[in-house]
């Protein structure tokens, strides 16, 4: 899918490197760690953009206010975009060059990772929860020690600096998602079990 129209919609240059995350704004989705991790990268790459998408639960809108304040106080605020929940998530994944899952607690089934993989994105996340099954480290993504934003930043940086590696990882993500996590693979595996 061509992301140029989506980039135009959000005012992002066609040649900008976009590092993105999609997640509910809550105590453990890791928006704070994400901002901490991308800040040095954005400082070093003035054309790069960090993109956050997600809303808070009803009654917890104050979390969004806190996040907005953290963004506006950031030394790279001009390179950070944040939107509320966006129904056309495929458009967002196609907008991103790197997908990040910075959840500070283990997420047993982060479907956002599978969705980004299906869109051919390399994944960076913390080494806990379901992402460890989805990402084959060094093949379609990189994992960092949980709750270590500096290490997360290093992993993002590695992909930010290497277009070829991003493309290789992206292709591997599509292949891995189809082979192991698609509906077709589920049906195939279920059929094999049933035959036994």
Predicted segments — roles?
Residues 17, 21-40, 150:
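A conserved mid-protein helix/loop that constitutes part of the nucleotide-sugar donor-binding site
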Residues 137-138, 142-149, 158-164:
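Conserved acidic donor-binding segment of nucleotide-sugar-dependent glycosyltransferases
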Residues 122-125, 135:
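Short hydrophobic beta-strand element within catalytic cores of glycosyltransferases
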Residues 85-86, 92-96:
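Short alpha-helical donor nucleotide-sugar binding micro-motif in glycosyltransferases
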Residues 94-108, 121:
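Acidic donor-binding loop of glycosyltransferase active sites
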Residues 64-84:
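Nucleotide-activated donor-binding/catalytic signature segment of Leloir-type glycosyltransferases, i.e.
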Residues 8, 151, 158, 165-179, ...:
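A short, well-ordered alpha-helix in the C-terminal region of glycosyltransferases
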Residues 1-12, 67-69, 189:
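A short helix/loop element that forms part of the nucleotide-sugar donor recognition site in Leloir-type
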